[in-house]
A protein has these predicted regions:
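Typically the conserved alpha-helix immediately C-terminal to a functionally engaged Cys/Sec
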Residues: 76-91, 112-114, 118
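Thiol/disulfide oxidoreductase modules built on the thioredoxin-like
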Residues: 62, 134-174
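Short active-site neighborhood of thiol/selenol oxidoreductases, capturing the structured segment around
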Residues: 56-81, 98-101
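Thiol-based oxidoreductase modules, predominantly thioredoxin-like and allied folds used
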Residues: 96-111, 124-136
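Short, internal strand/loop/helix patches
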Residues: 43, 118-143
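A short beta-strand-turn-helix
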Residues: 43-67, 88
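N-proximal helix/coil linker or "cap" segments that precede and/or mark the start of modular domains
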Residues: 19-44
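Bacterial N-terminal signal peptides
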Residues: 8-16
Length: 186
């Protein structure tokens, strides 16, 4: 009986260890810190910016410049707040040729009109909104579980990556991301 109890406790302990390992893993989406930020060109439909209603490679357009790149499923209040603040940062850092854009991985009808209205209503100056397929560009590894993926990069290397599941993105996250723009515009 003693032997059985010891074996049972060991099994429970090892099961708990395995479970904690999986539960503690964070969601990965998009290029990770230290990786190449632009694994391959892709051509989303730009809604605003220099080439509205045209497909253009935004990572190509920005080259090695500092960039805030977002992949999102749909607009929400905190995402719009982030977009507005990153637009202001992009304007402020125009001498460093900072670029910023959000690619919506979504094919729902009416999204282009909704995003055009967003760009107009928020008076976006330098921030480009674009649409791509629901899975996102394949080499960028956008997780199907990620609602919002933010990648800050410069010289084509990722400096910061933030990934959020649906409902997890909060106002405090907006402030953290905006403060980390300083890492790419040094």
């Amino acid at each position: 009986m003693k032997k059985f109890l010891v074996v049972a406790l060991m099994l429970v302990a090892s099961a708990a260890f395995v479970y904690t390992g999986y539960a503690g893993e964070s969601l990965k989406s998009g290029p990770q810190i230290g990786e190449k930020a632009r694994p391959q060109p892709f051509f989303p439909l730009n809604i605003n910016g220099p080439t509205p209603n045209e497909k253009q490679c935004l990572v190509c357009r920005n080259g090695d410049n500092p960039v805030a790149m977002i992949f999102a499923r749909e607009p929400n209040e905190n995402l719009v707040m982030l977009i507005k603040k990153l637009d202001a940062e992009t304007v402020k850092n125009s001498e460093k040729k900072m670029g910023s854009f959000c690619v919506f991985c979504n094919d729902s009808e009416g999204l282009s009109t909704k995003l055009a209205d967003l760009a107009k209503n928020e008076s976006l100056k330098k921030f480009t909104l674009a649409i791509d397929n629901p899975t996102g560009p394949a080499p960028y590894n956008i997780s199907k579980d990620a609602d919002i993926t933010v990648v800050l990069y410069t010289k084509s290397k990722v400096v910061a990556n933030y990934t959020f599941k649906k409902g997890e993105f909060k106002a405090a996250d907006v402030e953290k991301i905006v403060s980390d723009v300083s890492k790419i515009v040094k």
